[in-house]
Amino acid sequence: MTQFQIECVESKVESSCNQYGRFIVEPLEPGQGITIGNSLRRVLLSDIEGSAITAVRIAGVNHEFCSIPGVKEDVLELLLNLKNIVLKSYTNEPQIGRLKIQGACKVTTANFELPSEVEIIHGTQYVATVAENAILEMEFKIEKGRGYKIIDKKQTENSIDFLPIDAIFMPVRKVNYMVEEIFLRNSEIKERLILEIWRNGSVTPQDSISQAAEVLLNLFNPFKKINFENTDDSTEQTEDKISQIPIEELQLSVRAYNCLKRAQIHSIGDLLNVSQEELLEIRNFGQKSAKEVIDALQKRLGISLPKRKTNKKEN
């Protein structure tokens, strides 16, 4: 088993919603760097769970193409600001947040009223500017999910007063990786994986990598216990069952049935040991009876008898 170390060599906050971390994974066997790096990158960007505002109901507003009295931003601008808000939900159930504020003031996420299960990551994120004596009142839905959720038009039609928002659930916004060769003292060649991760602050760098690894483990774990059926054995079992079927199941005429019985042909297995030519050699078994047997085998069991005798070699 490959033994390697994972080390965070750099961590910094580039902005309130953009945090950076750089990790080094080494030593890896040749070829493992790109395998691990590419797999982690894909999972970090698409499968790490996050939280987002998915819909909002604004007092006095029934569609997104309008303005709000006393508010600097129109509805579309407000929806965009809500879309970019970073928060974290500790429950899988949808939650409702609220805001009711009177101006004049600048509204930030610090003004939100949230349930105890939801945490605002950046309390200074800007939301809107409200004029003096104007009131901004709204409710918004908070949900957990993965990736990017585009507005569902059917769901929009069923929503009452709520304006849907394209939700960005991804806590990891960008991932880069590089692979370098390293040379050990014994001249052995190994690889070093350099992983760069940009996050929105709702998940720690350690948690993001840990969650990504967990997703990959769950994805590949079933392959450890996979059972491949032996198709040859199953085919043989099917053939054995067919061979044991009595010729009565073919529902032949009395003449054809009696001729086969006198020839010691009692089952489909016995019948499969003869060809069409050999059928005609049975006493009192004519062309009509042979055709009846051939057609019954094909129609009921999908089996065709060979036309001519086969040379059977004895060892």
From Swiss-Prot:
GO terms for cellular component: cyanelle; DNA-directed RNA polymerase complex; mitochondrion. Its main location: plastid. Coiled coil: none annotated. Its EC number is 2.7.7.6. The keyword Transferase applies. Residues 239-315 are annotated as: Alpha C-terminal domain (alpha-CTD). It is found in: Plastid, Cyanelle. It comes from the Eukaryota. It catalyses: RNA(n) + a ribonucleoside 5'-triphosphate = RNA(n+1) + diphosphate. Pfam families: RNA_pol_A_bac (PF01000), RNA_pol_A_CTD (PF03118), RNA_pol_L (PF01193). InterPro entries: DNA-dir_RNA_pol_insert (IPR011262), DNA-dir_RNA_pol_RpoA/D/Rpb3 (IPR011263), DNA-dir_RpoA (IPR011773), RBP11-like (IPR036603), RNAP_asu_C (IPR011260), RNApol_insert_sf (IPR036643). Residues 1-227 are annotated as: Alpha N-terminal domain (alpha-NTD). The keyword Transferase applies. GO terms for biological process: DNA-templated transcription. GO terms for molecular function: DNA binding; DNA-directed RNA polymerase activity; protein dimerization activity. Keywords: Cyanelle, DNA-directed RNA polymerase, Nucleotidyltransferase, Plastid, Transcription, Transferase. In plastids the minimal PEP RNA polymerase catalytic core is composed of four subunits: alpha, beta, beta', and beta''. When a (nuclear-encoded) sigma factor is associated with the core the holoenzyme is formed, which can initiate transcription. The N-terminal domain is essential for RNAP assembly and basal transcription, whereas the C-terminal domain is involved in interaction with transcriptional regulators and with upstream promoter elements. NCBIfam families: PRK05182.2-2, PRK05182.2-5, rpoA. DNA-dependent RNA polymerase catalyzes the transcription of DNA into RNA using the four ribonucleoside triphosphates as substrates. Belongs to the RNA polymerase alpha chain family. This is DNA-directed RNA polymerase subunit alpha. It comes from Cyanophora paradoxa. The gene is rpoA.
